[in-house]
Every structure is written in C-alpha cells, then in structure tokens.
A protein has these predicted regions:
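Aromatic- and carboxylate-lined catalytic core of secreted/periplasmic carbohydrate-active enzymes
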Residues: 346-472, 483-498
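Catalytic-core region of carbohydrate-active enzymes that cleave or remodel glycosidic bonds
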Residues: 302-373
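Active-site mouth of glycoside hydrolases
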Residues: 36-39, 43-307
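N-terminal signal peptide c-region/cleavage motif recognized by signal peptidases
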Residues: 24-25
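Short, hydrophobic beta-strand segments that form beta-sheet elements in well-ordered domains
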Residues: 287-293, 310-314, 331-332, 436-437
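Bacterial N-terminal signal peptides that target proteins for export
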Residues: 2-19
Length: 498
C-alpha cells in the first residue's frame, strides 16, 4: 500500500507514477465498443454482440465470501455473456430492499472496499475505519482476478463506480460517512453525494481519485466497460412521466418515471470527463454507460453525458429503446425486478426489449447467493426472480440474435402488415433476413412485407430454441401470408433469403 502525502488528488498522481507498470494487466485486444457499422449494437473480439444475461446482485468482488469462480463457471455454462459489478463505494445492510440473501450485503467485518483499512476501530459494518488516502491492494487483486477470469470465459464486465445511497441504513455503512473513515470528511447530506456544484469539494476529490485509480489499473482489459452511477434518480430526481394515467396515485413507484436531476447529471459528466481524461494518457479506451431513468423516457441532450455510448434504463419498457433510437447509442435494460419471480415474466421482458432494438439486457438474478454461487438458490426471498431455467431461456435469445448478421439488423415496425391476435416485434436486414418475436394468442397467420424471392422460414421455441416448423417460401408479391404453428404465449421467427 502507498501512503498519500496530502489530498486525494495526489492519490491519482502517486499511484500513477509508481504502480501502473506493476499492476496493469497485459494489453489484449481492443475493448468492447459500439459497433462501427451500427452504434446501437456492440462489437467485441471482432464480432457484433448483444449482451444478454441473468446475473447476481453486483457484490462478487466486495463480498469476499462469494466464490466468484464458481459463479463465472455457472454463467458460462448457462450461456450468459455479461455481468455487472459495483466498485465498492456503496454496500448494503442485511435485509435491504427485502432481499433475504444479498450478495451486496457481506457479513460483518467482511466488506472489501477499494480503500485500505486504517488502524483505528469503528467502522459501522465491523472492523477498522477506512483510510481514504490509501487504496487496498487486496481489493484490487480480487477485482483484477475477477475481470480476468470473466474474460477467459467470454464474459463482459460492467463496473459501476458509484451508487445512490437510498436511505439512512445504507448511509450508516457508507465509506464516505464521516464516522467510517479517518479523514472524517464532512457530508452535509448523503443526497448531495453525487451532485454538482459539489457541497463537499474534498469528498468530490476522493470520488475523482477512486475513478482515476480504477480506470488506470484496469486499462488493459478488453472485456470491460464503465458505468458512472447506479440509479442516480433515486437520490436526486425530477418527475419525468407516468405509465398509467388512470391510477389515482400515478406519481409513485412503480408508475412514476423518475429522471435524473440536472445537478446529478452535471456530476456524472464530471466523472465521465475524468474517465476519458485518464484514458487519454493510456493505451485503451473503454465504453462509458449512463444510467438515466426507470421504465421509459424520451431523452434530450440535457439528460445525457456526452461521453456515454451506452444508455441504461431499469425496469424498462420496449419504448425505452424505441423512443431513443435516434441517439445512436446502445440502449440497455440494466436491471429487472419488482415484477414477481416467475421466469416467463423476465423472459418476455428480455425478448420484447432486445427485439425493439435494445442492445443489452441484464436480469437481476437472486438465485446467486453466497454458498449458492451456481445460481440454484431459487428459494431466496427477493423483489425479483432468477433460476437456471430462466438463464437457459435467455440463452435462447442470444442464440437467436447471433444467428443473423447482427450489425445489419434494424427495427422494422412496417415489415408486419397484419398480425391477428398477436403483437410482433421485428428486426430486419432488408432484402436479406428478418427476425421476429411474436407474442399473444396462437396460432396466427402473419401478413409480411416480404421482398420477392425464395426464403427459408423457421418458427423457434422461445423456451429452448428448438425449431417448431420449417418451410420454404416463394414470395411473389407483398404482403405474403405465413401461418404459424401452435404455440403457447410466444414464438420466434427467422426468415432468411435462400
């Protein structure tokens, strides 16, 4: 560990001068990025990719009791290609949000933060207080080991630097709480932690220092992108919209669409600028994600961090992708939940979102817990779902999308002229291929604006990916009629020119 001489700003300079040559991972291929031919999808290791996963509650590194190798083995086995991770600037108490077994709530004295422990007792979660002028080598080693192991297994990692505080229980455990660090940095209100102009400039310098430190140390990983903050609207929001106008209490969750306040957006822009500034002196450039709102909202420039290539919604509706297509960024559904625990609920959400043009889907999977890192704790009480069966069903979506030339696929709402009894979402590579998701009462007969020629159509089970029906089509003029097989609730359809 390296002792800093004065401010947190010096942290970045000192660590940059002394540690970068030792701790950086070996340089690999270019990091995951927006696809150069279609910025609404991603490109990784030379291929267009959609990130689709059902992953744990972001505590794999900060919770040292969690066996992350077993966890990554389960993700790889189930065909998941992505996981989300909190950097350790936020931790939860046991029982938070009604989660019985929470990977983001480590046992007492076990919280592994990015800062070193001091020699002074008194951290509210057990053990010594944090020294915000020193970074923890144990944390950094575990973080790098996790990202490297994920990369070997073909899994992309989203690292979220900061998180809203939500309430006094979380604040009691927060490393930035003056009672939990030896610097005793004064914080007038935890709600102002992630806002500009900074009400606590010293603390803002520590936030910048952590950001720059992790950006430097992780620069060599290709399976990594950064997210500035989780759910910034939770602590600082403006009312954006509501979902159902017929509810009497339309301005409460889960009907209210809360968007991030301008003061919080300004803070996120400052953190994003620190990321790009730091990487401007380093070999690699990593994508930045911005978490903007829950549910759905049409965004404008004032809502956005200019450096962000990925825009995240939580509990998202398909309209989140549809309404923001013109931004030319990847639109992600970054967290599910609060809709029960049935697999079919989150399977439907995933299909509807990605088939509306969303490039990323992350089901928050509560079946991953300490001791059940294989994702089999389906009895865990939590505000969401997750199971091995759901992960297999989500793999079917990825397999379906990646059978096409993904970078050429675009939402095509006019391709389906008529769809009795069902709702259809279509992605098209015009003149070459069409991918459809059909949900509703089957069987049905679709009327399609299919170009003249010979085509192969395959109706595919959304549960396990097997082909329900295959036929050759000779299209003479549009619209062409195509009859489905019997199906229960939903079916996928691939149409490819012969």
């Amino acid at each position: 560990m390296i002792r800093l001489k004065s401010s947190a700003l010096q942290t970045t300079r000192l660590l940059g001068a002394t540690c970068i040559c030792v701790l950086l991972p070996p340089l690999t291929a270019a990091p995951i990025r927006q696809h150069p031919d279609n910025p609404r999808w991603l490109e990784w290791r030379g291929k267009a990719v959609a990130l689709i996963t059902s992953a744990e509650h972001y505590g794999t590194v900060l919770n040292p009791d969690f066996d992350f190798r077993r966890y990554l083995e389960a993700l790889q086995r189930d065909g998941m290609n992505y996981t989300r991770l909190f950097a350790g600037s936020y931790v939860e108490p046991q029982g938070a949000f009604g989660i019985e077994r929470n990977t983001l709530a480590p046992a007492r004295r076990k919280f592994l933060a990015p800062w070193a422990r001091s020699d002074q007792p008194g951290y509210a979660g057990g053990g010594n207080k944090f020294d915000l002028d020193r970074f923890s080598p144990e944390y950094l080693a575990r973080l790098k080991e996790f990202i490297a192991e994920a990369g070997r297994r073909g899994i992309v990692v989203e690292l979220t630097f900061f998180c809203s505080t939500y309430g006094d229980q979380q604040w009691a455990l927060h490393p930035f709480n003056s009672t939990n660090n030896i610097q005793a940095v004064a914080v007038p209100s935890w709600k102002s932690l992630h806002t500009l102009p900074a009400r606590q400039p010293v603390l803002f310098n520590y936030q910048l220092a952590l950001t720059r430190h992790l950006v430097r140390e992780l620069n060599g990983f290709d399976n990594l992108f950064f997210e500035v903050q989780n759910e910034p609207w939770a602590d600082n929001h403006a009312m954006g919209d509501f979902i159902n106008p017929y509810l009497s209490d339309k301005y409460s969750f889960p009907n209210a669409v809360e968007v991030t306040s301008p003061e919080s957006v300004a803070w996120q822009r400052a953190i994003a600028k620190a990321i790009t500034d730091e990487e401007g002196r380093l070999p690699q450039r990593h994508l930045i994600a911005q978490n903007v709102a829950n549910f759905r909202f049409s965004l404008n420039d004032g809502d956005l961090v200019p450096e962000a290539g990925i825009i995240h919604f939580h509990y998202a509706y398909p309209e989140a992708a549809e309404w923001n297509r013109g931004l030319n960024r990847v639109i992600g559904y970054d967290e599910t939940g609060f809709a029960g625990n049935k697999d079919e609920t989150y399977r439907r959400q995933a299909w509807n979102f990605v088939m509306s043009g969303g490039g990323l889907f992350n089901n928050l999977d509560y079946s991953f817990t300490t001791g059940h890192e294989d994702g089999t704790d389906t009895a865990n009480k939590a505000p969401g779902g997750g199971s091995p069966a759901l992960r297999r069903q989500l793999k079917t979506i990825g397999d379906f999308l990646h059978r096409f030339d993904l970078a050429r696929l675009q939402p095509d709402p006019l391709f389906v002229a008529r769809a009795p009894g069902v709702v259809v979402r279509a992605l098209s590579h015009p003149g070459k291929a069409h991918a459809l998701y059909v949900q509703g009462r089957g069987p049905t007969t679709l009327s399609l604006q299919l170009a003249k020629g010979r085509w192969t159509a395959e109706w595919i089970s959304v549960e396990d990916g097997h082909v329900l029906k295959r036929e050759n089509i000779s299209a003479e003029k549009a619209p062409a009629a195509l009859a489905s097989p019997e199906f229960n609730d939903a079916v996928a359809l691939s149409i490819v020119r012969q």
